[in-house]
Amino acid sequence: MAEAGARRPFFRRRKSCPFTGANAPKIDYKDSKLLMRYVSERGKIVPSRITAVSAKKQRELARAIKRARFLGLLPYVIR
């Protein structure tokens, strides 16, 4: 039997991917405002375990960020 004061462990519900769904935004290298939400304050790409982006969309996002950096739309390093 379980103790009277024992609680069951808290499980955080998995967030759904912000790029899947009916009215989800498209990942585009020209949309620097959207891409900046997935870049840290130091300029690094934020991992999907923090942003809850699916693996496929994370690869698309990384490709778009790298393309935008190459074209000068996003900085490589933010000081």
From Swiss-Prot:
Protein name per UniProt: Small ribosomal subunit protein bS18
SUPFAM superfamilies for the chain: Ribosomal protein S18
Keywords: Ribonucleoprotein, Ribosomal protein, RNA-binding, rRNA-binding
Classification of source organism: Bacteria, Pseudomonadati, Pseudomonadota, Alphaproteobacteria, Hyphomicrobiales
Coiled-coil parts of chain: none
NCBIfam families in the cross-refs: S18
Subunit-structure text: Part of the 30S ribosomal subunit. Forms a tight heterodimer with protein bS6.
GO biological process: translation
Role played: Binds as a heterodimer with protein bS6 to the central domain of the 16S rRNA, where it helps stabilize the platform of the 30S subunit.
Annotated family: Belongs to the bacterial ribosomal protein bS18 family.
Alphabetized GO MF terms: small ribosomal subunit rRNA binding; structural constituent of ribosome
HAMAP family listed in its UniProt record: Ribosomal_bS18
Keyword Signal: no
InterPro entries xref list: Ribosomal_bS18, Ribosomal_bS18_CS, Ribosomal_bS18_sf
GO cellular component entries: cytosolic small ribosomal subunit
UniProt keyword annotation of Phosphoprotein present: no
